[in-house]
């Protein structure tokens, strides 16, 4: 389906292609079609593998570093833990059973999605590398969906109930779905696990303001959109160099930023 759409756009003599790959491991047909027409391609969101990006000098990528988002989410957890430690011990409001390790659930975005894999791997390794023991109770693939995360949390709760101390979500929407489940079950806020998201959506920022989500990592989608437009415009009007003769970078990544209650308002103004 996506290949057919690309073929149609090329037949309509487009100047530049902007493509969010359905399958990041299989871009070759799109690249071959664009190459035959000599039309540059800017991939965004799903980053193709390096070997594919290097197939041609008119291939570009705009997005963010999923590894960084996982690291920052882990750092947010560590900062909260360090700020609430009692005599070097994990805070009792987090380590409820007092066993010296954190029992956690993880909500993953999508099976095989690079961002999902990287966010999961790096948030866990960041916390563990800082010397905090973790015990994964379960994980759930909720496809970035608030409704799906709520449903899966409702299914998991009877099994684990008060054992869950920490919930790490690959995005805000799934974190919000978890919060919805706790609201529906009727668990009071001070008895809930610490919940962390990624993306800094409007609803996610509102949850931080209310205190139902502890923190998130801001994904600068507006900045990515502007970069995508700027590069597409340059390629269509000037070629592979900008107005000063500087070659356009093949990879443009916008940085993530930490968001918590003390600074969420500055990100709200960027919505």
Give the location of each predicted region.
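Alpha-helical recognition/docking segments in bacterial nutrient-uptake
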Residues: 1-72
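Exported/periplasmic ABC-transporter solute-binding proteins
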Residues: 166, 180-222, 226, 230-248, ...
């Amino acid at each position: 389906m996506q290949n057919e759409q690309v073929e149609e756009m090329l037949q309509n003599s487009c100047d530049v292609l902007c493509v969010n790959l359905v399958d990041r491991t299989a871009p070759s047909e799109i690249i071959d079609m664009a190459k035959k027409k000599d039309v540059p391609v800017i991939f965004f969101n799903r980053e193709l593998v390096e070997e594919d990006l290097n197939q041609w000098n008119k291939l570009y990528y705009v997005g963010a570093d999923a590894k960084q988002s996982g690291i920052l989410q882990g750092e947010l957890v560590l900062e909260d833990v360090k700020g609430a430690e009692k005599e070097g011990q994990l805070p009792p409001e987090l380590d409820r059973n007092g066993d010296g390790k954190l029992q956690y659930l993880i909500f993953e975005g999508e099976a095989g999605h690079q961002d999902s894999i990287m966010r999961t791997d790096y948030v866990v390794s960041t916390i563990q590398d800082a010397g905090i023991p973790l015990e994964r109770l379960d994980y759930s693939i909720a496809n970035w969906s608030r409704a799906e995360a709520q449903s899966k949390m409702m299914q998991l709760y009877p099994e684990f109930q008060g054992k869950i101390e920490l919930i790490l979500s690959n995005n805000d929407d799934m974190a919000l779905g978890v919060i919805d489940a706790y609201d529906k079950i009727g668990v009071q806020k001070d008895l809930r696990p610490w919940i962390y998201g990624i993306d800094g959506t409007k609803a996610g920022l509102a949850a931080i303001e209310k205190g139902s989500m502890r923190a998130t990592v801001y994904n600068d989608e507006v900045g990515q959109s502007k970069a995508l437009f700027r590069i597409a415009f340059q390629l269509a009007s000037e070629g592979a160099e900008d107005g000063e003769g500087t070659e356009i970078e093949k990879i443009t990544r916008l940085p993530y930023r930490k968001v918590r209650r003390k600074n969420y308002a500055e990100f709200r103004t960027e919505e």
